Regions:
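Short, contiguous alpha-helical
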Residues: 8-12, 16-19, 29-78, 122-163
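Basic/polar N-terminal segments that are highly enriched at the extreme N-terminus
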Residues: 1-5
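Acidic/histidine-rich alpha-helical segments that form the ligand environment
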Residues: 77-119, 134-139
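A structural signal for long alpha-helical coiled-coils and helix-turn connectors
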Residues: 26, 110-113, 154
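Hydrophobic alpha-helical core bundles mediating ligand binding, dimerization, or RNAP-core interactions
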Residues: 11, 15-18, 22, 98, ...
């Protein structure tokens, strides 16, 4: 196994855990806020998708498919308080966009050689992803960080623990 394979394992495990937590949640349940001021899962999914798109596109320009028209504008810090489902995408729509972005991330990763992972990231992301390995690895850890919050929402909604 090489470094790229190890990063892919992390991305695949993040998808497995995240999609496991999301599997039986309804669109309405994705709007549940676990605490006052906390972001609901629908917004978090949009945020994760926009973040992955921007970060991977910054290290591998032209590698990511375009986000649907208006997508990024629906999932900004300013829209985190939106609870109106008419202003947001459904779980099915979000996962479809996520799957397209993740497939592109994996394709871009597969084109690299291990030495590429040491390349310095663009200035805009260097504070949290100093090199390309960090930029790619962050996609899995970011997803898992949010998935930990989804586990709490699941328990609040009466769902059993999964993992």
């Amino acid at each position: 196994m090489n470094s790229r394979d190890a990063i892919k394992v992390g991305l695949d495990m993040a998808d497995f855990v995240g999609k496991g937590y999301l599997g039986d949640l309804t669109d309405a349940e994705l709007l549940h806020r676990p605490a006052k001021g906390a972001n609901h899962i629908n917004w978090q999914l949009g945020h994760l998708i926009v973040s992955e798109h921007q970060i991977i596109e910054s290290v591998a320009p032209g590698s990511m498919p375009a986000l649907p028209a208006g997508f990024a504008a629906k999932y900004t810090k300013e829209t985190a308080s939106v609870d109106d489902p008419a202003q947001l995408l459904t779980k099915e729509e979000l996962l479809k966009v996520h799957d397209a972005q993740r497939a592109a991330t994996l394709a871009a990763l597969a084109k690299l050689v291990d030495a590429d992972l040491d390349r310095e990231s663009p200035e805009a992301i260097r504070s949290y992803a100093p090199n390309w390995a960090n930029a790619y690895s962050l996609q899995g850890s970011h997803w898992l960080m949010h998935a930990g919050q989804w586990a709490v929402v699941r328990r609040q909604l009466g769902r059993p623990p999964l993992f």
